[in-house]
Amino acid sequence: MSRPEQQFKKVLKNPQAQYAVYPTVKVERISTTEHSYFIATKPMFEGGRRNNVFLGQQIRQSVVFKYVSKKEIPGNEVIVMKALQDTPGIIKLIEYTENAMYYILIIEYIPNSVDLLHYHYFKKLEENEAKKIMFQLILIIQNIYEKGFIHGDIKDENLIIDIKQKMIKVIDFGSAVRLNEDHPQYNMFGTWEYVCPEFYYYGYYYQLPLTVWTIGMVAVNLFRFRAENFYLNDILKGENYIPDHISETGKQFITDCLTINENKRLSFKGLVSHPWFKGLKKEIQPISELGVDYKNVIT
């Protein structure tokens, strides 16, 4: 066994190796034109939609491998991630390779992080923390918009948060598409539970009102336990989805985002100037510049 492989197995034995990666997992080697990697053969997330994501390592830097089936998505995720490479708040694509069946994306690994769904698994967030998370998300989404793309699947699972620094990054660009804000869209690529009501009613939607709707859904769910996640059907049934314990401006933000009539919904460009976010700085500080030392991931 080579020394790099021994080092990687030390990472897998570390309790902070995250999720479903265990010390007994087997390790394989993958080579690209640029680097050679070791990869765990057990997914980071077992079951569900993300059993195609694996922890890996190149020399002394941990990375994440994502396998994208060529049958499902014709390389769009790679194209979008390359175009957004320098965008703050976006998970970075280090490089990619492919085989007969898959595009293999090699993505940066953020230590001490978890997806937002698991972050509020057993707790409802305090309003101030939730507000800062939502403001970061809006700034990141607007940066994506300015580059000419729409993420297409904004939800708790596609946001990771650095537990110590409370900074977030957007992941999973498998549903991302080119911005086409003036034309109706007839295909839905995102998660059905987060679909906007107009798609159910009319069979089409516009990209920006859909984005505002999904932002509102994320905001509601931050104030709930994971098992209580709220979806469109709950709203259409008339159930009260506004948290009682938050400020009036917080309640108004959620109401403005989750208005059934898309023409009365908060505008995409009006998100950042909503009174709920008064006093917050309009900047995104990358996690990688906040003290994360990838060389110290291996102990």
From Swiss-Prot:
Residues engaged in binding ATP: F45, E46, G47, G48, R49, R50, N51, N52, V53, K66
InterPro entries: Kinase-like_dom_sf, PIM_Ser/Thr_kinase, Prot_kinase_dom, Ser/Thr_kinase_AS
A single Gene Ontology CC term: host cell cytoplasm
Subcellular location(s) per record: Virion; Host cytoplasm
Limits of the Protein kinase domain: 39-277
Residues at the active site: D153
SUPFAM superfamilies: Protein kinase-like (PK-like)
Record keywords: ATP-binding, Host cytoplasm, Kinase, Nucleotide-binding, Serine/threonine-protein kinase, Transferase, Virion
Record's keyword annotation contains Nucleotide-binding: yes
Key word Transferase present: yes
Catalytic reaction annotation: L-seryl-[protein] + ATP = O-phospho-L-seryl-[protein] + ADP + H(+); L-threonyl-[protein] + ATP = O-phospho-L-threonyl-[protein] + ADP + H(+)
GO MF, one example: protein serine/threonine kinase activity
EC number: 2.7.11.1
Family membership noted in the UniProt record: Belongs to the protein kinase superfamily. Ser/Thr protein kinase family.
UniProt function note: Essential for viral replication. It may mediate the virus progression through DNA replication.
Cited PANTHER family: PROTEIN KINASE DOMAIN-CONTAINING PROTEIN, SERINE/THREONINE-PROTEIN KINASE PIM
Protein name as annotated: Serine/threonine-protein kinase 1
